[in-house]
Amino acid sequence: MDPSTTKSFIASTTRRNLVYEVRFTSTSDEGDNRFSWLVSWLQQIYARRANDPARSQEVSEETSDNTKRPDAVSGIIYVPYRLDCDVLSSKLRENKIGAAAYHAGLSTTERTECQDRWIASAPGYDIIVATTAFGMGIDKQDVRFVVHWSLPKSFEGYYQEAGRAGRDGWFARCLLFYSREDRDRVGRRISKDIGNSNGHAIGKGGQAAKDKEIQMKSRAESFQALAKYCEQTDRCRHMAIGEFFGEKEVKACDRACDFCMEGEGLKKRKRDGLASEEWVSTQMERSDFYGDEYD
């Protein structure tokens, strides 16, 4: 490839129709309020849509066979484990919320059927509760929300998954449930993976070992950046995302994130949400959260 004949095109990471929000919580059995909050929030969405005459008119004009419900709303909930998919989707259905599980443990036929019904907004398939196995190559325009049930392993992964919302250009919510318990759990897992990887790489030696070390260091730094993004309560989420990806002069979103909507109220919500957790961030702030190898 001749560099003199190539051109680079760089698009902005900013999508102003996405509303980013971090929900602070505890994932201990006593303090975990994620499910009750989620059900209440979803029920409010269903009620608003069902009682909106304009929405009913819009749906009737789109479909002549009355197969699409006025209150239907498409969403994705990302969870870390297959068991979480099954349990959470079952609990949502018990609360009369159409949800289906999608993970690698299902057969190809089951996954395809689930995906097709969700894309078609079939009854009972408003929401897909999925692991990260879901989403690649799927383009459903009217996804109104993406929820991360726990902290993802990387900033890039979070941004890509959240970006599956609102592809039709209309407003969509990107919610991330954040707890310091999750942060520490994922951090320990990454630290362990780094240790194991370094051990294998040292055995190989040479350039392979150096490349692996760089890769794992980048992985740790990406996760640290995402945890910092969640902890921040003093800046626009869109600005923080843009700066992570190297954009300059990203403007504040004007009410398309929790900071720009809530201001000082976000700090209080963080204090209240994380009050039951023990603050153990000193290691992270000293940048040795993942061990001495990346000091």
Residue ranges and their predicted role:
Residues 142-143, 147, 151-160, 165-295:
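C-terminal accessory region of SF2 helicases/translocases
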